[in-house]
């Protein structure tokens, strides 16, 4: 049974992070506080430290629960084309999810990181076709669909380090998914996959940062905002 997450929640490891969006607003380098860029860097470091401390058994359990939660989403179950990332490192795992989506006859597109950090796309068939590409990101062999192919997806599932209750997404800082999500038509679901505890009251955001419309964690899913930029 799907658990709908409360509007904002946080576990104990987030106690050291600012709890309200106002804590991040309009701080500058003039002595009043850290810049948005510095705030993002601090939050990234905290999230990554918490993820690295997660036991392997907990990560494996999270993978199964995350897959189950994603598959309860109507927009995923009815999608003809799903765009989803190939997880690496401490990202919420997608290996199981990719195979399940493929077994349901959905057309599964995965990102191919380019040298300029933009995202091309390719069709996922099996794990065996994956090989490490730019910056160690795994991608399929075969034809590239172009950076605009993500606009054809009925739903886009993206990685994130944290998401605010208003849909603001904290990524790795390269801007890859900001560029990709900017190509997704308004109204299309764009959902971030997270671990429990990573949906926060607010995260620092800048004008170019693209928002997500919902999140899925091992504990369930939550709709945040309607589709749009």
Where are each of the predicted segments found?
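A short, gly/pro- and small-residue-rich
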Residues: 99-103, 172-183
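N-terminal active-site beta-alpha-beta segment that forms phosphate/nucleotide-binding
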Residues: 2-152
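Surface-exposed, charge/polar-rich loops and edge strands
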Residues: 2-38, 42, 49-53, 132, ...
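A structured binding-face within diverse protein domains that lines the active/interaction site
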Residues: 140, 159-161
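Short glycine-rich anion-binding loops that position phosphate/pyrophosphate groups of nucleotides
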Residues: 88-90, 161-165
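A residue-level signal for conserved active-site and pocket-lining positions in enzyme catalytic cores
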Residues: 47, 84, 108, 157, ...
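Glycine-rich, N-terminal phosphate-binding loop of Rossmann-like dinucleotide-binding domains
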Residues: 86, 160, 219
């Amino acid at each position: 049974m799907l658990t709908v997450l409360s509007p904002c929640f946080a576990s104990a490891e987030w106690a050291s992070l600012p709890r309200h969006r106002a804590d991040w607003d309009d701080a500058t380098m003039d002595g009043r506080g850290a810049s948005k860029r510095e705030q993002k860097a601090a939050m990234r470091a905290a999230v990554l430290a918490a993820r690295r401390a997660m036991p392997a058994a907990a990560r494996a359990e999270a993978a199964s629960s995350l897959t189950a939660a994603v598959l309860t989403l109507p927009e995923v179950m009815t999608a003809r084309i799903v765009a989803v990332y190939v997880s690496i490192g401490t990202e919420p795992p997608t290996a199981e999810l990719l195979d399940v989506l493929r077994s349901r006859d959905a057309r599964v597109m995965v990102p191919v990181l380019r040298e300029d950090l933009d995202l091309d796309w390719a069709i996922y068939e099996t794990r065996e076709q994956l090989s490490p590409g730019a910056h160690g990101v795994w991608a399929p062999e075969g034809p590239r669909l172009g950076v605009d192919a993500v606009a054809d997806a009925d739903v886009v599932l993206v990685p994130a380090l944290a998401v605010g209750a208003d849909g603001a997404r904290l990524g790795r800082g390269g801007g890859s998914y900001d560029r990709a999500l900017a190509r997704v038509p308004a109204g299309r679901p764009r959902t971030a996959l997270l671990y429990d505890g990573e949906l926060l009251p607010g995260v620092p955001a800048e004008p170019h940062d693209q928002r997500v419309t919902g999140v899925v964690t091992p504990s369930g899913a939550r709709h945040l905002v309607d589709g749009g930029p």
